[in-house]
UniProtKB/Swiss-Prot annotation:
GO terms for cellular component: Cajal body; chromatin; cytoplasm; Golgi stack; nucleus
Listed Acidic residues bias regions: 364-374
UniProt: ATP binding residues: I43, G44, Q45, G46, G47, F48, G49, C50, I51, K71
PROSITE patterns listed in its UniProt record: PROTEIN_KINASE_ATP, PROTEIN_KINASE_DOM, PROTEIN_KINASE_ST
Subunit structure: Interacts with HDAC1, KAT2B, SETDB1, KDM3A and KDM4A. Associates with the nucleosome through interactions with nucleosome DNA, histone H2A and histone H2B; the interaction with H2A and H2B is mediated by the nucleosome acidic patch, a cluster of negatively charged residues of H2A and H2B forming a cleft within the nucleosome core.
Descriptive protein name: Serine/threonine-protein kinase VRK1
Chief place where the protein resides: nucleus
Protein function: Serine/threonine kinase involved in the regulation of key cellular processes including the cell cycle, nuclear condensation, transcription regulation, and DNA damage response. Controls chromatin organization and remodeling by mediating phosphorylation of histone H3 on 'Thr-4' and histone H2AX (H2aXT4ph). It also phosphorylates KAT5 in response to DNA damage, promoting KAT5 association with chromatin and histone acetyltransferase activity. Is involved in the regulation of cell cycle progression of neural progenitors, and is required for proper cortical neuronal migration.
Catalytic reaction annotation: L-seryl-[protein] + ATP = O-phospho-L-seryl-[protein] + ADP + H(+); L-threonyl-[protein] + ATP = O-phospho-L-threonyl-[protein] + ADP + H(+)
Protein location: Nucleus; Cytoplasm; Nucleus, Cajal body
Protein backbone atom coordinates (compact mmCIF):
# COMPACT_ATOMS: atom_id res chain seq x y z
CA UNK A 1 0.00 0.00 0.00
CA UNK A 2 2.10 2.90 -1.20
CA UNK A 3 2.10 6.26 0.43
CA UNK A 4 1.43 9.31 -1.68
CA UNK A 5 4.84 10.38 -2.84
CA UNK A 6 6.12 13.73 -1.70
CA UNK A 7 7.40 14.58 -5.15
CA UNK A 8 4.31 15.74 -7.03
CA UNK A 9 4.36 17.28 -10.48
CA UNK A 10 6.69 20.24 -10.64
CA UNK A 11 8.41 19.40 -7.36
CA UNK A 12 11.72 17.67 -6.88
CA UNK A 13 12.13 14.51 -4.85
CA UNK A 14 14.49 14.18 -1.91
CA UNK A 15 18.22 14.39 -2.31
CA UNK A 16 19.93 11.04 -2.69
CA UNK A 17 21.07 9.67 0.66
CA UNK A 18 24.25 7.83 1.54
CA UNK A 19 23.93 4.15 2.33
CA UNK A 20 25.14 2.65 5.57
CA UNK A 21 28.02 0.23 5.16
CA UNK A 22 27.68 -3.22 6.65
CA UNK A 23 28.98 -3.82 10.17
CA UNK A 24 30.41 -7.19 11.14
CA UNK A 25 28.63 -9.42 13.63
CA UNK A 26 30.21 -8.88 17.03
CA UNK A 27 30.92 -5.19 16.52
CA UNK A 28 30.42 -3.16 19.70
CA UNK A 29 28.58 0.16 19.74
CA UNK A 30 28.21 2.46 22.75
CA UNK A 31 25.08 4.54 23.31
CA UNK A 32 24.78 7.99 24.88
CA UNK A 33 24.47 6.45 28.35
CA UNK A 34 27.75 4.55 27.89
CA UNK A 35 25.94 1.23 27.62
CA UNK A 36 27.59 -1.19 25.21
CA UNK A 37 25.63 -3.20 22.66
CA UNK A 38 26.84 -6.06 20.48
CA UNK A 39 25.60 -6.42 16.92
CA UNK A 40 24.40 -9.70 15.48
CA UNK A 41 23.46 -10.68 11.98
CA UNK A 42 21.96 -8.11 9.60
CA UNK A 43 18.27 -8.82 9.09
CA UNK A 44 17.35 -6.08 6.68
CA UNK A 45 18.63 -3.27 4.51
CA UNK A 46 16.68 -0.32 3.23
CA UNK A 47 17.48 2.52 0.91
CA UNK A 48 19.54 4.35 3.51
CA UNK A 49 20.15 2.14 6.54
CA UNK A 50 20.52 -1.35 7.94
CA UNK A 51 18.87 -3.30 10.73
CA UNK A 52 20.78 -5.78 12.87
CA UNK A 53 19.95 -8.13 15.69
CA UNK A 54 21.40 -6.74 18.91
CA UNK A 55 21.87 -7.49 22.58
CA UNK A 56 23.73 -6.04 25.52
CA UNK A 57 27.47 -6.65 25.27
CA UNK A 58 28.77 -9.87 26.78
CA UNK A 59 31.28 -12.60 25.99
CA UNK A 60 28.59 -14.47 24.05
CA UNK A 61 27.77 -13.88 20.41
CA UNK A 62 24.38 -12.45 19.51
CA UNK A 63 22.08 -15.33 18.61
CA UNK A 64 19.04 -15.53 16.39
CA UNK A 65 16.83 -15.15 19.46
CA UNK A 66 18.20 -11.68 20.29
CA UNK A 67 15.59 -9.48 22.01
CA UNK A 68 16.46 -6.20 20.29
CA UNK A 69 17.27 -4.71 16.92
CA UNK A 70 19.44 -1.74 16.07
CA UNK A 71 18.68 0.62 13.21
CA UNK A 72 21.78 2.23 11.69
CA UNK A 73 22.11 4.99 9.10
CA UNK A 74 24.69 7.63 8.11
CA UNK A 75 24.41 10.50 10.60
CA UNK A 76 23.79 13.10 7.91
CA UNK A 77 20.64 11.29 6.77
CA UNK A 78 17.32 12.28 8.26
CA UNK A 79 14.68 9.50 8.41
CA UNK A 80 15.97 7.84 11.57
CA UNK A 81 16.49 11.22 13.25
CA UNK A 82 12.80 12.11 13.00
CA UNK A 83 11.76 8.75 14.42
CA UNK A 84 14.36 8.95 17.16
CA UNK A 85 12.89 12.20 18.49
CA UNK A 86 9.57 10.46 19.13
CA UNK A 87 11.19 7.52 20.89
CA UNK A 88 13.32 9.73 23.11
CA UNK A 89 10.34 11.82 24.18
CA UNK A 90 7.65 9.19 24.50
CA UNK A 91 8.94 5.60 24.46
CA UNK A 92 11.34 5.17 27.35
CA UNK A 93 10.68 1.85 29.14
CA UNK A 94 9.88 3.55 32.44
CA UNK A 95 7.31 5.81 30.76
CA UNK A 96 5.57 2.87 29.15
CA UNK A 97 5.63 0.77 32.32
CA UNK A 98 4.16 3.61 34.36
CA UNK A 99 1.32 4.00 31.87
CA UNK A 100 0.62 0.26 31.88
CA UNK A 101 0.49 0.28 35.66
CA UNK A 102 -1.67 3.38 36.11
CA UNK A 103 -4.10 2.38 33.34
CA UNK A 104 -4.21 -1.27 34.44
CA UNK A 105 -3.24 -2.65 31.03
CA UNK A 106 -1.71 -6.04 30.31
CA UNK A 107 0.69 -4.44 27.85
CA UNK A 108 1.00 -1.38 25.61
CA UNK A 109 1.84 -1.76 21.93
CA UNK A 110 4.49 0.97 21.74
CA UNK A 111 8.05 -0.23 21.04
CA UNK A 112 10.44 0.45 23.90
CA UNK A 113 13.40 2.70 23.25
CA UNK A 114 16.58 1.21 24.75
CA UNK A 115 19.25 3.60 23.58
CA UNK A 116 20.82 5.55 20.75
CA UNK A 117 24.02 7.29 19.82
CA UNK A 118 26.65 7.92 17.18
CA UNK A 119 29.21 5.35 16.05
CA UNK A 120 32.34 6.09 14.03
CA UNK A 121 33.61 3.56 11.51
CA UNK A 122 36.31 4.08 8.89
CA UNK A 123 36.17 7.83 9.36
CA UNK A 124 32.40 7.99 8.89
CA UNK A 125 29.72 8.76 11.49
CA UNK A 126 26.58 6.65 11.89
CA UNK A 127 23.45 7.25 13.94
CA UNK A 128 21.86 4.23 15.61
CA UNK A 129 18.83 3.41 17.74
CA UNK A 130 18.02 0.25 19.71
CA UNK A 131 14.40 -0.86 20.10
CA UNK A 132 12.47 -4.07 20.72
CA UNK A 133 12.47 -6.88 18.19
CA UNK A 134 9.17 -7.90 16.58
CA UNK A 135 7.63 -10.59 14.44
CA UNK A 136 5.47 -10.41 11.33
CA UNK A 137 3.46 -7.42 10.21
CA UNK A 138 -0.32 -7.67 9.96
CA UNK A 139 -0.34 -6.92 6.24
CA UNK A 140 1.42 -10.20 5.47
CA UNK A 141 -1.01 -12.12 7.65
CA UNK A 142 -3.99 -10.25 6.22
CA UNK A 143 -2.97 -11.12 2.66
CA UNK A 144 -2.22 -14.74 3.57
CA UNK A 145 -5.65 -14.92 5.20
CA UNK A 146 -7.61 -14.14 2.02
CA UNK A 147 -7.62 -10.42 2.90
CA UNK A 148 -10.09 -10.83 5.73
CA UNK A 149 -9.92 -10.72 9.50
CA UNK A 150 -12.78 -11.93 11.66
CA UNK A 151 -15.01 -9.40 13.37
CA UNK A 152 -13.61 -10.41 16.74
CA UNK A 153 -10.04 -10.02 15.49
CA UNK A 154 -10.75 -6.56 14.07
CA UNK A 155 -12.34 -5.40 17.32
CA UNK A 156 -9.54 -6.88 19.46
CA UNK A 157 -6.90 -5.23 17.30
CA UNK A 158 -8.71 -1.90 17.40
CA UNK A 159 -9.07 -1.94 21.18
CA UNK A 160 -5.31 -2.35 21.52
CA UNK A 161 -4.65 0.33 18.89
CA UNK A 162 -6.89 2.73 20.82
CA UNK A 163 -4.73 2.04 23.88
CA UNK A 164 -1.65 2.92 21.81
CA UNK A 165 -3.16 6.07 20.33
CA UNK A 166 -4.33 7.36 23.69
CA UNK A 167 -0.78 6.94 25.00
CA UNK A 168 1.04 8.67 22.15
CA UNK A 169 -1.60 11.43 22.02
CA UNK A 170 -1.13 12.10 25.72
CA UNK A 171 2.59 12.42 25.02
CA UNK A 172 1.96 15.20 22.46
CA UNK A 173 2.30 13.08 19.32
CA UNK A 174 0.06 11.69 16.62
CA UNK A 175 1.12 8.82 14.37
CA UNK A 176 -0.40 9.75 11.02
CA UNK A 177 0.13 6.44 9.21
CA UNK A 178 -1.76 3.64 10.94
CA UNK A 179 -2.08 0.58 8.68
CA UNK A 180 -1.53 -3.17 8.77
CA UNK A 181 2.06 -3.00 7.52
CA UNK A 182 2.92 -0.70 10.45
CA UNK A 183 1.43 -3.09 13.00
CA UNK A 184 3.82 -5.84 14.08
CA UNK A 185 3.21 -8.82 16.30
CA UNK A 186 5.33 -9.35 19.38
CA UNK A 187 8.31 -11.58 18.64
CA UNK A 188 7.23 -14.07 21.30
CA UNK A 189 3.51 -13.42 21.84
CA UNK A 190 1.30 -13.48 18.70
CA UNK A 191 -1.59 -11.99 20.68
CA UNK A 192 0.25 -8.71 21.20
CA UNK A 193 0.40 -6.07 18.46
CA UNK A 194 2.70 -3.03 18.27
CA UNK A 195 2.44 0.16 16.23
CA UNK A 196 5.77 1.00 14.57
CA UNK A 197 7.25 3.46 12.05
CA UNK A 198 7.12 6.90 13.63
CA UNK A 199 8.68 8.61 10.63
CA UNK A 200 5.43 10.53 10.13
CA UNK A 201 4.86 11.10 13.86
CA UNK A 202 3.97 14.73 14.43
CA UNK A 203 4.18 16.72 17.64
CA UNK A 204 0.72 18.23 17.42
CA UNK A 205 0.68 19.78 20.89
CA UNK A 206 4.19 20.97 21.90
CA UNK A 207 4.28 22.20 25.49
CA UNK A 208 0.51 21.77 25.71
CA UNK A 209 -0.37 24.16 22.87
CA UNK A 210 -2.32 22.53 20.04
CA UNK A 211 -1.38 23.45 16.49
CA UNK A 212 -3.96 25.55 14.67
CA UNK A 213 -6.10 24.21 11.84
CA UNK A 214 -4.47 25.45 8.65
CA UNK A 215 -4.75 24.06 5.13
CA UNK A 216 -1.49 23.94 3.19
CA UNK A 217 -1.74 22.90 -0.48
CA UNK A 218 1.90 21.80 -0.43
CA UNK A 219 1.11 19.13 2.16
CA UNK A 220 -2.06 17.68 0.65
CA UNK A 221 -2.55 13.89 0.85
CA UNK A 222 0.26 13.12 3.33
CA UNK A 223 0.26 9.54 4.55
CA UNK A 224 -1.02 6.37 2.87
CA UNK A 225 -3.70 7.53 0.45
CA UNK A 226 -6.38 4.88 1.05
CA UNK A 227 -6.29 5.34 4.82
CA UNK A 228 -5.19 8.91 5.44
CA UNK A 229 -7.57 11.39 7.05
CA UNK A 230 -9.64 14.03 5.31
CA UNK A 231 -7.58 16.64 7.18
CA UNK A 232 -4.40 15.22 5.63
CA UNK A 233 -5.99 15.20 2.18
CA UNK A 234 -6.62 18.93 2.69
CA UNK A 235 -3.03 19.64 3.72
CA UNK A 236 -3.79 20.07 7.42
CA UNK A 237 -1.25 18.89 9.99
CA UNK A 238 -2.18 15.59 11.70
CA UNK A 239 -4.27 15.63 14.86
CA UNK A 240 -5.91 13.16 17.21
CA UNK A 241 -9.15 12.94 15.26
CA UNK A 242 -7.15 12.12 12.13
CA UNK A 243 -5.52 9.09 13.77
CA UNK A 244 -8.93 7.84 14.87
CA UNK A 245 -10.40 8.35 11.40
CA UNK A 246 -7.52 6.37 9.88
CA UNK A 247 -8.19 3.53 12.33
CA UNK A 248 -11.83 3.52 11.21
CA UNK A 249 -10.83 2.99 7.58
CA UNK A 250 -8.46 0.21 8.64
CA UNK A 251 -11.25 -1.56 10.53
CA UNK A 252 -13.53 -1.44 7.51
CA UNK A 253 -10.88 -2.79 5.16
CA UNK A 254 -9.77 -5.56 7.52
CA UNK A 255 -13.33 -6.78 7.95
CA UNK A 256 -14.76 -6.28 4.46
CA UNK A 257 -11.62 -6.76 2.40
CA UNK A 258 -11.85 -3.44 0.57
CA UNK A 259 -12.55 0.29 0.74
CA UNK A 260 -14.85 1.96 -1.82
CA UNK A 261 -12.13 4.26 -3.19
CA UNK A 262 -9.47 1.58 -3.67
CA UNK A 263 -10.28 1.34 -7.38
CA UNK A 264 -8.68 4.74 -8.05
CA UNK A 265 -5.84 5.35 -5.61
CA UNK A 266 -3.79 7.14 -8.25
CA UNK A 267 -6.19 10.07 -7.95
CA UNK A 268 -5.91 11.36 -4.36
CA UNK A 269 -8.55 14.02 -4.98
CA UNK A 270 -11.02 11.28 -5.93
CA UNK A 271 -10.12 9.42 -2.73
CA UNK A 272 -10.58 12.59 -0.66
CA UNK A 273 -13.94 13.40 -2.24
CA UNK A 274 -15.15 9.84 -1.70
CA UNK A 275 -14.23 10.00 1.98
CA UNK A 276 -15.98 13.36 2.38
CA UNK A 277 -19.11 12.01 0.69
CA UNK A 278 -19.20 8.89 2.86
CA UNK A 279 -18.48 10.88 6.01
CA UNK A 280 -21.75 12.72 5.41
CA UNK A 281 -23.56 9.40 5.11
CA UNK A 282 -21.89 6.70 7.18
CA UNK A 283 -24.82 4.35 6.54
CA UNK A 284 -24.09 4.38 2.81
CA UNK A 285 -20.45 3.55 3.53
CA UNK A 286 -21.52 0.54 5.57
CA UNK A 287 -23.98 -0.57 2.87
CA UNK A 288 -21.24 -0.35 0.26
CA UNK A 289 -18.68 -2.31 2.26
CA UNK A 290 -21.04 -4.77 3.94
CA UNK A 291 -23.85 -5.64 1.51
CA UNK A 292 -24.62 -8.85 3.40
CA UNK A 293 -26.49 -9.14 6.67
CA UNK A 294 -24.90 -8.71 10.09
CA UNK A 295 -23.39 -5.30 9.46
CA UNK A 296 -20.93 -4.24 12.18
CA UNK A 297 -23.02 -1.54 13.84
CA UNK A 298 -20.21 -0.80 16.27
CA UNK A 299 -17.93 0.36 13.44
CA UNK A 300 -20.67 2.64 12.11
CA UNK A 301 -21.17 4.07 15.59
CA UNK A 302 -17.41 4.52 15.97
CA UNK A 303 -17.21 6.44 12.68
CA UNK A 304 -20.21 8.59 13.61
CA UNK A 305 -18.54 9.48 16.91
CA UNK A 306 -15.16 10.31 15.38
CA UNK A 307 -16.60 12.53 12.65
CA UNK A 308 -18.08 14.85 15.29
CA UNK A 309 -14.68 15.60 16.84
CA UNK A 310 -13.28 19.10 16.46
CA UNK A 311 -9.71 19.45 15.19
CA UNK A 312 -8.32 20.37 18.62
CA UNK A 313 -10.76 18.29 20.68
CA UNK A 314 -9.52 15.59 23.01
CA UNK A 315 -11.28 12.32 22.16
CA UNK A 316 -13.11 10.27 24.75
CA UNK A 317 -11.06 7.13 24.26
CA UNK A 318 -13.00 5.04 26.74
CA UNK A 319 -16.25 5.91 24.96
CA UNK A 320 -14.74 4.60 21.73
CA UNK A 321 -13.51 1.45 23.48
CA UNK A 322 -16.97 0.92 24.96
CA UNK A 323 -18.48 1.08 21.46
CA UNK A 324 -16.12 -1.66 20.28
CA UNK A 325 -16.71 -3.71 23.42
CA UNK A 326 -20.43 -3.62 22.65
CA UNK A 327 -19.56 -5.03 19.25
CA UNK A 328 -17.77 -7.95 20.88
CA UNK A 329 -20.79 -8.54 23.10
CA UNK A 330 -23.10 -8.49 20.08
CA UNK A 331 -21.26 -11.47 18.56
CA UNK A 332 -21.17 -13.36 21.85
CA UNK A 333 -17.56 -12.62 22.59
CA UNK A 334 -15.52 -10.50 24.99
CA UNK A 335 -12.17 -8.75 25.26
CA UNK A 336 -10.09 -11.83 26.07
CA UNK A 337 -6.88 -10.52 24.53
CA UNK A 338 -6.82 -13.22 21.84
CA UNK A 339 -6.35 -11.98 18.28
CA UNK A 340 -7.40 -15.21 16.52
CA UNK A 341 -5.66 -14.13 13.35
CA UNK A 342 -6.44 -17.31 11.39
CA UNK A 343 -10.24 -17.12 11.74
CA UNK A 344 -12.01 -15.51 8.81
CA UNK A 345 -15.71 -14.71 9.09
CA UNK A 346 -18.13 -11.85 9.50
CA UNK A 347 -21.56 -13.08 10.38
CA UNK A 348 -22.95 -14.54 7.15
CA UNK A 349 -19.91 -13.39 5.18
CA UNK A 350 -17.24 -16.09 5.02
CA UNK A 351 -14.06 -16.02 3.04
CA UNK A 352 -12.59 -19.02 1.29
CA UNK A 353 -10.45 -21.21 3.56
CA UNK A 354 -6.80 -20.32 3.53
CA UNK A 355 -4.64 -23.01 1.96
CA UNK A 356 -2.38 -24.87 4.37
CA UNK A 357 0.67 -23.68 2.48
CA UNK A 358 -0.34 -20.04 2.88
CA UNK A 359 -1.07 -20.56 6.57
CA UNK A 360 2.37 -22.08 7.01
CA UNK A 361 3.96 -19.13 5.22
CA UNK A 362 2.15 -16.70 7.51
CA UNK A 363 3.26 -18.63 10.59
CA UNK A 364 6.86 -18.75 9.38
CA UNK A 365 6.83 -15.03 8.72
CA UNK A 366 6.08 -14.42 12.40
CA UNK A 367 9.47 -15.88 13.23
CA UNK A 368 11.52 -14.33 10.48
CA UNK A 369 10.19 -10.96 9.37
CA UNK A 370 11.77 -8.38 11.60
CA UNK A 371 12.81 -6.85 8.31
CA UNK A 372 9.23 -5.62 8.02
CA UNK A 373 10.48 -2.61 10.00
CA UNK A 374 11.58 -0.67 6.86
CA UNK A 375 13.77 -3.34 5.34
CA UNK A 376 12.79 -3.55 1.68
CA UNK A 377 14.38 -1.02 -0.62
CA UNK A 378 11.04 -0.21 -2.25
CA UNK A 379 9.20 0.46 1.00
CA UNK A 380 12.06 2.48 2.39
CA UNK A 381 12.46 4.67 -0.66
CA UNK A 382 8.70 5.43 -0.64
CA UNK A 383 8.89 6.29 3.03
CA UNK A 384 11.96 8.45 2.45
CA UNK A 385 10.20 10.56 -0.15
CA UNK A 386 7.39 11.36 2.28
CA UNK A 387 9.68 11.81 5.27
CA UNK A 388 11.94 14.28 3.49
CA UNK A 389 8.99 16.64 3.56
CA UNK A 390 7.71 15.59 6.96
CA UNK A 391 11.08 15.92 8.66
CA UNK A 392 10.97 19.68 8.33
CA UNK A 393 7.82 19.95 10.36
CA UNK A 394 8.60 17.50 13.18
CA UNK A 395 9.40 19.54 16.29
CA UNK A 396 13.09 19.49 17.15
Amino acid sequence: MPRVKAAQAGRQGPAKRRLAEHFAAGEIITDMNKKEWKLGSPIGQGGFGCIYLADMNSSKSVGNDAPCVVKVEPSDNGPLFTELKFYQRAAKPEQIQKWIRTHKLKYLGVPKYWGSGLHDKNGKSYRFMIIDRFGSDLQKIYEANAKRFSRKTVLQLSLRILDILEYIHEHEYVHGDIKASNLLLSYKNPDQVYLVDYGLAYRYCPEGTHKEYKEDPKRCHDGTVEFTSIDAHNGVAPSRRGDLEILGYCMIQWLSGHLPWEDNLKDPNYVRDSKIRYRENIASLMDKCFPEKNKPDEIAKYMETVKLLDYVEKPLYQKLRDILLQGLKAIGSKDDGKLDLTVVENGSLKAKPVAKKRKKEAEESVESSVEDMECSDKQTEEATQTRSKTRKRVQK
